[in-house]
Amino acid sequence: MLSHPATSSVPAMTLADFTNPSLMIPHLRGQDAASVIQELSRILQREKRIPDLLPFYHAALNREYMVSTDMEAGMAFPHARLPGLKELSFALGRSDEPLAWGSKTPRSVRLVFLMAVPATDATQYLPLISGLARLGRDSRLVNRLQAATDSSQMLVALQQVELRTSAKPDLMT
């Protein structure tokens, strides 16, 4: 497990604390950034993590076209920061085949983390980004996520990355 020395008795948060199995798609249907962001936005709306599909989808897509969030580890981190979002959360999609991601210099991506970020909350956003970056540097966990065939396998891999923060969200409901 990627962890840090404990500084309090609060249980350690992991990447899994910001999502749940109903926010994961182990076999994405989308073939490009726009369709994958739409697919993941739909489950964020279905699970009531975002109030309206179109404003969130357009904000995430516009942000992605301005600056691509792809990483060498085969992951992308599109996101939108909007007012009215109640909690920081993300949807995770896994593509069976690599997707060309990025408008200027496309990279192959198989894992897409679409983050819904409240406009007023930067306190939990930074530890989440840091945890996702650490995940990208752990090839063993990236490989586990890329090989996952269901949401429970994806969740187990995310539980291996601990975050530095003291507030724990309750997204498993």
Regions found by a protein language model. Name each.
Residues 1-173:
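Cytosolic covalent-transfer regions centered on His/Cys nucleophiles
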